[in-house]
Amino acid sequence: MEPVVGLQSSCAVSSFPTIEIWQDVLAQAMTGELIAAMNYTSLSEICDDPEEVADALEHAGIERGHAARFAAEGRRIGVAVQNNVEGKHWKKLREAFLRCIAARDFIGCLIVQEIMLESFAVASYARVGRVGPGTQGRTFAAIAAEEEEHIDHAMEILRAERARDVQGFDEKMYRLHLEVMTTLAEMLTKECRTGHCEVCHGTCVKPALFDISLSAAELRGASLQQYLKTLDMLGLPGEVTLQWVTQLPV
């Protein structure tokens, strides 16, 4: 489920072998999926409706399945795909979600997971799917499509919530935007500012993404476009949400 690279370390130009680049791309994706599985499991614990509990647990299982598929792609190329849900950026994202859990804020949880994290996952996975060789590309593309279904699943609930209280919903959306989207944007900034991400197995892979026809800027741009599209589907004014995005780290 989540953005493919959050790769912060020394940004000196690297000479990564292609397999090592894919190892790190898969590691970020696998970690994001495990975070999503943890989030859905936590969400199930605050749901009162048995159907909502079952739905959240089903989503958790799907995300764990995605993580397993990314690990399998690593084995296909002869590498062990590491993950680290305690990695700097992923830990911050998890903590933001857990604050919504502590407040029993079901809508806040949906906003963080389904709107913010899934938007980055859909867009970044789709981009990786276009350039990934063989089964890697097909796996990323397939999981991107599955993640998009998660967004669609949440839209009806969130639209109804916004219709009940537009101002309250939009204020919550903006508060979570500053908290969560700032971290997501930091993962794909041009310059590395906060040290190693604690997921990549070596130095920062971002400069090496060009070797597999990707770039952090491309992934960031696509992810933010998907996010804006999702906010538009919720009914938030485009002129407002565009200002939100321009405030994010670059």
What residue ranges belong to the model's regions?
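Non-heme di-metal
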Residues: 1-250
